[in-house]
Amino acid sequence: MSDERGYSSADLPLYYEWHGKSAGSQPPLLRVHGGGSTIETNWGLLIPALEESRRLLAVELQGHGRTGTGAGPASFEGSAAGLAALLAELGVGPVDVLGFSNGGQVGLQLAARHPAAVRRLIAASAPFRREGMVDGFWAGLAAATLTDMPRPYFDADVAVSGDPAHAERMFHLDRELMLTGFTDFPDSLIASIAAPTLVVAADRDVVRTEHAVRLASLIENARLLIVPGSHGDYLGELFAAAGDSGPLERTVPFLTAFLDD
C-alpha cells in the first residue's frame, strides 16, 4: 500500500505513488515500468524487497494504469519530459532511476536529455536500436492484435483504470510506440549520459546480449550485468516471474550495491 499518491499537473497528468522509508542522504528511486504494465504488475514484488531501505517513487506512463490515454501517440522523449516535470513539481532530484524495457528506454532519454534529474540509472532490458531485438520480435509485434495481449496484463489494467477500453488503448499505444515511434537512439545521445549507469539484461531476454554490451560500452561510466533468466523475471515482473521471487532475490543485491556505491 502506498503512503502517498497523486497526479502531476501536466496537460496529461501522470499518476504516481510513494512507497518505503527515507534512507538518510540517499535519493528516492524512481521506477519506470515497461509496456503493457501497471505499478502492480511491474513492481509488485520489488516494492517489498526495497521499501524497508529506500524511498520509492513509481509512476504510470501515458495510457497505463491510472494515467489517461491522452489524445496523441506516446513517445520516449515525451515520457522523459513528463517525468522530469513531475520530479520538478515534487521538488525531488536528482533521483536514482530504474527503468525496465520501454521504461528503460524512457530512462535513457531522461538521463540524456534531463541530466540534472538523474543521479544514477539502471537501464534494464532496454533496447536503444531496433536491431537490438531478438529474431522474430518485430514480425511478431507487427502481427499482434489485442487478443495476443496476455490476459493478466489486460485484467490488471482494468482493475485500476476501471475501463476495458483503457486497456485496449494501452495495447495500441505500446504497439505503435515500438513499431513507428521507436527510431534508433543516436550513439551520440547515449554517449552523452553522464550519470553512472548499470545496464542489465537476462541471458534469455528479448534484447540481445550483445546489444546490452554495446549500450554499456557507449556510456563512459557504465557497468554491465547479465543475469540468468528471461525478460523481466529478474525484477519480479508479473507475467515473466509467474509468482517466483527467486530471480528477483538473486538480482536485488546487485542493484542495491550499485545504487549504494
What does each model-found stretch correspond to?
Residues 44, 48, 57-98, 241-249:
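Active-site loop/oxyanion-hole signature of alpha/beta-hydrolase fold enzymes
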Residues 105-113, 119-153:
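Flexible "cap/lid" loop of the alpha/beta hydrolase fold
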Residues 173-189:
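Active-site nucleophile elbow and catalytic-triad environment of alpha/beta-hydrolase enzymes
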Residues 193, 199-201:
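Short beta-strand/loop motif that positions the catalytic acidic residue
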Residues 228-261:
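Catalytic active-site module of serine/aspartate enzymes centered on a nucleophile-bearing elbow/loop
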Residues 33, 95, 99-104:
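Conserved alpha/beta-hydrolase "nucleophile elbow" surrounding the catalytic nucleophile
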Residues 11-68:
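Conserved HGGG/HGGXW glycine-rich cap/lid loop of the alpha/beta-hydrolase fold
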Residues 206-211:
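Conserved alpha/beta-hydrolase "acid-adjacent" motif
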